[in-house]
């Protein structure tokens, strides 16, 4: 696809960007490269490819573990704790 001044001006308007005159030729070149890459992707023959629709990550069983020493250590890092909970300032009236 050819990127001309009219198309670049339209893209500027749609994107609400202003491209300085000294950068316009460079931007047109970069856009042409991107569109060329997209055209290559569209040209790929994918009709006969087998798709893997059942890909998933196997789940592990959740096994609760009681580790009270970890909770005590975490609560000890805070200056304000009470009855195994963090005490924080009231933020909702």
UniProtKB/Swiss-Prot annotation:
The keyword Protein biosynthesis applies. Allows the formation of correctly charged Asn-tRNA(Asn) or Gln-tRNA(Gln) through the transamidation of misacylated Asp-tRNA(Asn) or Glu-tRNA(Gln) in organisms which lack either or both of asparaginyl-tRNA or glutaminyl-tRNA synthetases. The reaction takes place in the presence of glutamine and ATP through an activated phospho-Asp-tRNA(Asn) or phospho-Glu-tRNA(Gln). SUPFAM superfamilies: Glu-tRNAGln amidotransferase C subunit. It comes from the Bacteria. Coiled coil: none annotated. The keyword Nucleotide-binding applies. Its EC number is 6.3.5.-. It catalyses: L-glutamyl-tRNA(Gln) + L-glutamine + ATP + H2O = L-glutaminyl-tRNA(Gln) + L-glutamate + ADP + phosphate + H(+); L-aspartyl-tRNA(Asn) + L-glutamine + ATP + H2O = L-asparaginyl-tRNA(Asn) + L-glutamate + ADP + phosphate + 2 H(+). This is Glutamyl-tRNA(Gln) amidotransferase subunit C. NCBIfam families: gatC. Belongs to the GatC family. GO terms for molecular function: asparaginyl-tRNA synthase (glutamine-hydrolyzing) activity; ATP binding; glutaminyl-tRNA synthase (glutamine-hydrolyzing) activity. It comes from Helicobacter pylori (strain J99 / ATCC 700824) (Campylobacter pylori J99).
